From Swiss-Prot:
InterPro entries: Asp/Glu-ADT_sf_sub_c, GatC
EC number: 6.3.5.-
Gene Ontology molecular functions: ATP binding; glutaminyl-tRNA synthase (glutamine-hydrolyzing) activity
GO term, biological process aspect, one: glutaminyl-tRNAGln biosynthesis via transamidation
Major subcellular location class: mitochondrion
PANTHER family: GLUTAMYL-TRNA(GLN) AMIDOTRANSFERASE SUBUNIT C, MITOCHONDRIAL
Subunit structure, as described in the record: Subunit of the heterotrimeric GatCAB amidotransferase (AdT) complex, composed of A, B and C subunits.
Record protein name field: Glutamyl-tRNA(Gln) amidotransferase subunit C, mitochondrial
Locations listed in the record: Mitochondrion
Function summary: Allows the formation of correctly charged Gln-tRNA(Gln) through the transamidation of misacylated Glu-tRNA(Gln) in the mitochondria. The reaction takes place in the presence of glutamine and ATP through an activated gamma-phospho-Glu-tRNA(Gln).
Length: 198
């Protein structure tokens, strides 16, 4: 039997003589290892996090710095850096909402708080020696190449600029979080298609 379960079993007893299905209570003076009622650790963490804000649990939106406007140049720059394409206005609106939520961290007082660290900062991580084992023959290596030229890999060109025409209605997206709607506006292509039908 697991040592943890032995500790729990020895520190609890049945509330009645029958005890079938009844709540277990610890003996007097015993340390409780398991809480009587489950609690949501995420909610508890969120409350503790909010208590560290300068202005309590309620966040004063006027203290936040101004939201940067999202334009076509910024979208293409983010797409090039992240290699992720925004496929709809909802994706751009979600990005704007994430920026807005991240700006609340500016109000967190981190004075006298040590930065987080990982266990790897104080532990050694041994790696294998870089010793060549059995080299693969060239024909097996070239199986991974879709296109070849004079026994060289041909890679697709990188950082190709995407189309510069505006795919989204950015005026509506920049007003989206101030309107207070839970979802982003309809896609520009859908609105244009419906306008043609009329």
């Amino acid at each position: 039997m697991n040592r943890f379960f032995k500790i729990v079993l020895t520190s609890t007893r049945r509330a009645s003589t029958n005890g079938s299905g009844k709540r277990k209570t610890p003996f007097e003076g015993d340390k409780v290892h398991i809480p009587d009622e489950p609690y949501n650790s995420k909610v508890r963490f969120f409350i503790c996090f909010k208590k560290k804000l300068k202005h309590g649990i309620q966040i004063d939106e006027s203290l936040l710095s101004e939201m940067p406007p999202i334009d076509a140049k910024l979208i293409s720059h983010l797409e090039r850096l992240s290699l992720v394409r925004f496929d709809s206005e909802q994706a751009v609106a979600n990005l704007r909402n994430s920026i807005r939520m991240a700006k609340r961290l500016e109000l967190v007082d981190v004075e006298d708080v040590e930065p987080m660290h990982t266990v790897w900062e104080s532990q050694e991580c041994p790696t294998f020696d870089d010793v060549e084992e059995e080299p693969l023959p060239i024909d097996k290596v070239f199986r991974n190449a879709a296109v070849r030229f004079d026994d060289f890999f041909v890679t697709p060109p990188g950082n190709v600029p995407l189309e510069s025409n505006e795919r989204f209605d950015l005026n509506v997206i920049n007003k989206w979080d101030t309107i207070g709607k839970p979802v982003a506006p309809e896609a520009k292509t859908i609105r244009l298609a419906e306008g043609r039908r009329k």
